[in-house]
Amino acid sequence: MPLIRKPPSAAAPQTAAPALDARAVLEALARGNDDERWAAARAAADFPAAVPALGDALAHEKSPTVRQALFSALARIATPQSVETILPFLRSDDALIRTEASDALLAMRDVAWPFVPVLLRDPDASVRTQACVLVRDMPSPVAVSLCCDLLDSEPDPNVCAAAVEALAEIGEASALPALMRCADRFRATPFLEFSIRIAIDRVRSQVLNPRA
Amino acid sequence: MIFTEAKRYYVERRAVDRMLGTRSDSFEHYFGRLRADVQGEIEQFVNAFTVNETYFYREEHQLVCLTSDLLAARLTVKPRGEPIRIWSVPCSTGEEPYSIAIWLLENWPHVDEYDIEIVGSDIDTDAVALARVGVYGKRALMRLPARLVDKYFEADDGASWRILDDLRQSVRFTAVNLVDRANTRLHGKFDVIFCRNVLIYFDDLARRTAAENLFENLSPGGFICLGHTESMSRVSPLFDVARFADAIVYQRPMR
């Protein structure tokens, strides 16, 4: 019946590698192969001083696997400097990188939150759209009012749609007037009117049947 | 671990239990004890918060997938002679790793041709200690056919059954914290990891860290099975989705 015919100690391959020091981390981030860069990115989370090197590495990294570890290291360091290092990647032409950057910000929401209102006013509509997603996923007492303010002034219907989607998730009764004003403003944009109608129904049903 | 407002009662009840267990007369007194880790209180506190509700042959479809597809896929890329390594994490009180062992013995025709190492790990050291003992009540055995209970257990008394020694020695148990990389790395690389119903308790950052640790613990091409309500795609892009007839699992890419 035994499943092992030789002692487990002989059978178990070991993966424990010596811990990297800060210098070795920087060296491997800059010049290592895929496995070495992955290991260095993971180890870098223990070295807040590595933030600029992580940013440089992200700018050139081609491997999605290593990139994930680089974003995670910045999220684990979780300083305003690491948030600032991630923000430019919200402007990437690659949607995957934009999502990875957004996920990394969500993983350090307390540190990232102060940057979100600024992102909602960014000149780039796609950054404002990403910011609406962050607002949706970072619960905050001012999240609803931020979305409502945006709905009153935002010229781009796609950004408004992202804010409407956020309000459909987090909205409360106070959001209804802003949603209705936005529907009025975009009467000529049927998809947005439709989204707003759904969001209003959802907010109303949440007001009537609040979740536990 | 993350507990929302809805779990306040759950948290309070366990904190009160630990205060009683340590004869602390106020929360301040207990909190001081916890922070100083007096007599390993941090471990006791963590143990109090873990959920150890499970049973044999839970999510059997994944066990079917293991013997129908996953092991065959691993054998096509593994060097001959290397052991097959399977990790059950978290393993709670051992029902899952012992289920894997019984399932393999009953359902995998090649079971005698390979060394198969099954490791069960959990952060709850009390649960790990119980897993090593391997004594179970009726509820844990409810899904196991009576024939298998007779074959792999001996009746302790009318209400509990003990895993046979041979089978007990086929599973190695360890304590592990999934978000502690140094800790997970010590366990080596596995062909298949069962990691069910734990990532849902983590916050975003802990989930990312755990996913990356599990990625490192998988051999290239190795598989990870999550609970049926969980999706690795929502946690991490590191893994590929692998769809089989009996289960959807996740796979570390070969490269």
Regions flagged by a language model, labelled:
Chain B
Residues M1-W87, C225:
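Conserved AdoMet
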Residues L66, I193, L218:
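Residue-level signal for inorganic ion chemistry
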Residues T67, A101-L105, F215:
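A structural alpha-helix within SAM-dependent methyltransferase catalytic domains
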Residues V89, P109-F194, V198-T209, M232-S233:
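Extended basic-aromatic, gly/pro-enriched interface segments that bind polyanionic ligands
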Residues T93-V111:
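Conserved SAM-binding loop of SAM-dependent methyltransferases across substrates and taxa
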Residues V192, S233-R255:
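Core SAM-dependent methyltransferase catalytic element
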Residues R208-P220:
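A short glycine-rich, Lys/Arg-flanked "PGG" loop and its adjoining helix->strand segment in the class I
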Residues P220-H228:
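Conserved beta-strand signature within the Rossmann-like core of class I S-adenosyl-L-methionine
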